[in-house]
Amino acid sequence: MSEVKKIATRESYGNALVEIGKEHEDLVVLDADLAGATKTAIFQKVFPERHIDCGIAEGNMMGVAAGLATTGKVPFASSFAMFAAGRAFEQIRNSIGYPHLNVKIGATHAGISVGEDGATHQCNEDIALMRMIPGMVIINPADDVEARAAVKAAYEYVGPVYMRFGRLAIPVFNDESTYKFELGKGVVLREGSDVAIFATGLEVYESMQAAEMLAADGINAKVINIHTIKPLDEELVVASAKECKKVVTVEEHSIIGGLGSAVCDTLCANYPTPVLKIGVNDVYGESGPAVQLVKKYGLDAESIYTKVRAFLA
């Protein structure tokens, strides 16, 4: 059996910017002295006149992006998730969110899979921060195919968008020839009636693998890819809860304020259902190889399988 192709979604981001930039001259890319790491250097190499390095000044970068948006440009402001959502939160809130400007934020190196950079750079709080900004769209793609499609969808959408990309190369499981990205709509990857598993980002593939293990035990898990966390596909969430009676959420993010919280908010208001939230518990990360950290923090397929089995017992 051939090995599964793996690509980091941060690389997908850089490649997608070039694809869009070839067709749309209004696209401008900004970075904060991290073009090599965020992969916007791919765009910079092709369109140097449309790439602006703002230096290590993320807040200023967001302000520059906001200004460009008022002139009709479509700016993509790029940095690590910790520095974009974290350090520049005030500028995103007040300069981009409040006036609802057409700025796209490309946040790379999100989650525990940043690896050796350690707790200071492993942003497990960004989705929670961005969810609280009125009108902010949040996208967390699951693989290369979805990531490139998501960047294009973000460009076409008029309004602020926060996109979350990873450092770790992850399996590409979507078929580019048939895949279609629809903003705000979840994707059912596997049907089942015993439990509904809502996953996002790199946890989608892990959840699919966990579902295979559960199937071997006679447990039929429905797996849903939630690439758009805001606006959430509430209709699909409620329908799946009614069908399966128990719900699991899986995310490479804190269990506080992320996908799990969004799903719980929806179910509390519409169809109260037992929910197991799998993610980073209320702790900081640590330095180590990304794959080992994913396993240590209980986010690999085997850990998901074990937790779901216990939840259903």
Q: Residue locations for each model-derived region?
A:
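Thiamine diphosphate
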Residues: M1-R164, A169, ...
